[in-house]
C-alpha cells in the first residue's frame, strides 16, 4: 500500500507461537507488505532439521536477514507500509531494524506479543505437525522453546512498544496515533 503519510514499519518482539504471523497477516489485509525471513529461509534452504542441520540456522539466516533488510528499505522508500514477521529477540536487533526503518523515512512501531509458556507450547506443538509443508511451522521441542525463552529479552519500559492484546485494531490505533504525532511534529518545523 502506498501511503500519503510517511510509511509505517511494524516490528514485532515475540517468541514462536506468540501470534506474529497472525498479526502480520491481519496487517496485510489492511494493505501492509509482509516480509518474513522464515519463509525466505524455507525458499532458499528447505525444511529446518530435514534439508539442513539444526545447528546451521543462524549461519544460513544471516544473509537472509541482510536481504530482507534491503527489501524493507526499498519497500519503505517506495512509500509502502511494511510489517516484518520476525521475533526480534534482543533490544539490539530491534534498535538496528528500527534504524533501518527510520533511515528509510518510515515511522517504526514495535509490537510486543507476550504469551505464557503454556500458550506458546500449545500453539507450537500443534504447528509442529505441519513443519514439512509450512515455512511458519518450524519444528522444535518444548526444551527448545524453553531455551529460546531464556535468550529472549522482552522490551523494557524504556523501549517504546505497544503490548499486543490479540486485537489488530490496537496496533492500527497505535499506528494512527504515531502517524498523527509525526504529522504534528513535521508541521511544527
Cite the ranges covered by each PLM segment.
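Walker A (P-loop) ATP-phosphate-binding motif of ABC ATPase nucleotide-binding domains
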Residues: 9
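Conserved beta-strand scaffold positions in the cores of enzyme catalytic domains, especially
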Residues: 32-34, 108-110, 159-163
Amino acid at each position: 500500500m502506498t501511503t500519503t503519510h510517511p510509511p509505517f514499519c511494524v516490528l514485532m518482539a515475540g517468541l514462536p507461537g506468540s501470534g506474529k504471523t497472525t498479526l502480520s497477516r491481519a496487517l496485510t489485509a489492511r494493505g501492509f507488505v509482509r516480509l518474513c525471513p522464515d519463509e525466505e529461509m524455507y525458499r532458499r534452504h528447505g525444511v529446518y532439521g530435514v534439508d539442513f542441520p539444526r545447528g546451521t540456522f543462524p549461519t544460513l539466516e544471516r544473509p537472509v536477514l541482510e536481504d530482507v533488510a534491503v527489501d524493507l528499505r526499498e519497500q519503505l522508500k517506495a512509500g509502502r507500509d511494511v510489517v516484518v514477521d520476525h521475533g526480534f529477540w534482543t533490544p539490539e536487533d530491534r534498535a538496528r531494524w528500527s534504524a533501518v526503518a527510520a533511515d528509510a523515512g518510515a515511522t517504526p512501531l514495535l509490537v510486543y506479543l507476550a504469551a505464557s509458556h503454556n500458550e506458546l507450547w500449545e500453539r507450537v506443538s500443534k504447528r509442529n505437525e505441519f513443519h514439512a509443508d509450512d515455512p511458519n511451522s518450524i519444528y522444535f521441542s518444548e526444551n527448545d522453546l524453553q531455551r529460546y525463552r531464556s535468550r529472549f529479552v522482552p522490551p523494557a519500559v524504556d523501549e517504546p512498544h505497544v503490548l499486543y492484546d490479540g486485537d489488530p485494531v490496537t496496533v492500527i490505533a497505535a499506528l494512527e496515533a504515531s502517524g498523527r504525532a509525526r504529522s504534528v511534529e513535521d508541521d511544527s518545523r
